[in-house]
Amino acid sequence: MLAPIQKFTLGLYSEHLTSIGFLLDLRQAYFGAGDVPWTKVAELDSRIEAHRDALELGGPDATHHAVQLLASDDTDALRGAVYHLAWIGPKAKGHKEMITAWMGVVEDRLTTYKQALRYAAQAHRQIDVGVVLKSVDPLLLEAALKVSRFCEDVKAEQVLPLCSHDAVTVRRAAVELIALKGARPLLPTLERAVLDEAKSVDERNSFWLLVLGSTRVLQAAREACRRGETIAPQWLMCLAYAGSAADLPLFTRAVGNPASRLAALQACGVFGHVELVPLLIAALAAADEFERVTAATALETITGAGLTEQAVMALTTEVESADVVGTTDGNTKVADDVVEFTRICTVQGEWAAWWSANLSRFGASPRWRRGKPATLGVFIEQLAEPSSSDQLRRMNQLELVVRSGMSIDCAWDGPVAEQLVAIGKWQQWWKKVQAEHANDYWLFAGRG
């Protein structure tokens, strides 16, 4: 039987670990919400650090308790335990037990492990993920690759064989990892695997080849768009991020193709060419609400107009038939509330009036991003702005890599302190090269 002081101490450890797990989940929700400045998440990072420091004071006893919580049904407690055992590193007792538990975890707990391990890895903590990368379980392999992106001791060459794995999810995760680690010497090998030797071209992997500077992918994307068939969204995104003015007719054509219309509208926002604005305004006349919202989102991405509207959404809940008067069997969906929320304006007339009044100030650049010329300097500026959405920051980060040929990772959901360091590196780089690239809107992979 535990002494009262031991029970109290274990209770404190549980509270610290559960709090870490809760805060990890909360910070993820904040990043996805869009209404909280991303820099404010630093406060949650500080609270996680405080709980972590308290656990480190607990030494082996705290670690032992974290190992025990790997079997917990409490998701927050499990998430916190995984994070703590990852943070202490491979040489510490408890880390190996966590890795072993990860390899045997059931599918519905994989996300919890991945979330905790990614956050630890994003802070440059060493995680013994090598053994997991040898797993035969595709789901586990995919999760391990997502974590390994941030593990400095996992080299791109190490995961190259997984680019030919039987599972498409594993292949995609492996190619993404290699691209985001900036392993440009591996590009010819990846081009052969993705474009030549595969039974069919995986457009998602093709996009990651673009991130590594592949011109062959651009040729394939242009050919796919010219065929006029159903166009995979990733082909359009390849052209959008490469940003060549010569590709403008392909976007116009894709918007007019019903089979590729939605993907084309989304890609138009990334492409950002000012001549697409009237086409996007015309798309707001669509009967389909999702199509109108997609077109409006693209318009906002280009112009930064800030036009909004109030919309309503019905919330429904499923209740057992026994709880509903007049029903006898099966589940019944009952609308229990209607929520009003603010979203980007989808009214064609308002956008047309705004564009007519503001068209004259959009002559300084062919491409625009949130109302500013789409230069690399603007991308970096928006990357640092506290009010920038996670969607905008991810978009700008990717295009910075594609158009500059640099590989400075800035994970949109990583520790805020690490993000600020990465942004600082981008700012320093731009300060050195801006005289050369200030007026270059079509730079691709540092080669023009």
Show where each model-derived region lies.
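N-terminal alpha-helical scaffold/docking segments in eukaryotic complex subunits
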Residues: 1-111, 115-126, 135-141, 145-155, ...
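Amphipathic alpha-helical scaffolding segments comprising HEAT/armadillo-like alpha-solenoid repeats
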Residues: 59-70, 90-103, 122-134, 152-164, ...
